[in-house]
Structure formats: C-alpha cells, structure tokens
Amino acid sequence: FAIANAEITSAQLVNGTPSSTKQVAEAELQISGQGQASTNIQSNTTWTFSFSIGETANMVLSFLANPEMKADVTLVPPYTAGNAQANMSADFTLRRISQISGDAATPAPFVNWSPDGVNTNAVCVNVGSCVDVDPESLNETMGVGPGNSTVTHSLGTAGSNYSLTITGLTRGNYSLTLAGLTSVNVTQVPEPGTLMLLGGALAALGFGGTRRRSQATAA
C-alpha cells in the first residue's frame, strides 16, 4: 500500500501565532514490484504569506524542526535483494513582488534559503545582510541496498532551532513561501520464482514545533 497526507495548521500569521505544517508519506511492499509515496507542499499555492513594509526594515524567520530519517534493508532467506529510499527537502523564498506606488524604482530584494546543516549558505540579493542558522540539514536523500544495510539521519534526536535574519529590506510588497517535500520508494529485486520481498517506507515533514521524520525500510 501507499498513502500520503499533508496538513497546514494556523496558516495565517496573526498576533504572533506561529504557522505549522505536517507531511507524511508511507509505502509498504509485500509482493514483487515497487512501492512509492510522496507528499508535496507547493509554496506557490498553499503556503504563501504576503505583507507590506512602509520603510526599510529587518526580518527574522525562525522555527523548530526535527529531521529524522532511516533507510534499511534486512534480508531474510529466501529474500535476496531490496532497495529503500527516503527523501526530504525544504526551501524558503522571500521576494519583493512590487513597490509602493510613487516610489522610485530600486533593485528588488530576493532571498532563498535551503537549510543544509551549514550556516551562511542563504542566497541574499539586494538586502543589507543575511545570517542563517542551520543546526541540521532539511534537504537529504538516503538510499540503501541491494544487500543488508542501514543508514540514518538525525534519528532519535530532539528538534533544533533554525533562524534566518535579514536586514535592509526596502519598502514594498513581499511574499514569503515554503516548498516542502517528503517521498519514499521501496523496490524488490527478485530472483525469478524464488523471492518475495517485504518492503516499507515512511517519510514525514513538520515545521513550527512539529516533528519532521523520514524512514524507509525493506526486509
């Protein structure tokens, strides 16, 4: 079977109340073939905040996330081979979409941030400065197989605090978007007439005090 689901909670920022998202994708394979599931939050349509600033301003984006991933292949005779893969990605984009009426034309600020566990990796254009804190990577692809093997990412750890501080945003109308993706894929590689592989996979993504988890298994 394969299932996927997504939830956006308190999507509107009101009186300091944080927004949060949850994603889950799960697949289990018990016969010859392939199982796959994915959940995708497309920022252009489902997670966009629009706001205006009347003078040069600074912005701080902060959230709690817990990226947990596991991919595992454990073979039990007569099973001979299997593959399991889990993926997660997160990407934030801030852009000025228009200027205030009557203002002289100025270069449009643009910021893109894909937390990868390395600080100072945000792309910042036409702003004063950018400082990002990425305790762990939120952009990972993990896979194992065809033999017995296991690989994990941040499994069993507590959530971490992430932040992006931007200075020198000019007057104008802005949008802040999030694109998040979780996906899993399990495949059996049979010897003709001899192999039945049990495979499973699980992936989930959460922001704003929620857990982010990704797991793939094959046995």
Task: Give the predicted meaning of each segment.
Residues G147, E191-G193, A216:
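Generic low-complexity segments that are intrinsically disordered, proline-rich and/or Lys/Arg-biased
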Residues A179-A204:
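Short, threonine-centered small-residue motifs that mark membrane-proximal processing/anchoring sites
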Residues L195-A219:
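C-terminal cell-surface anchoring/sorting signal
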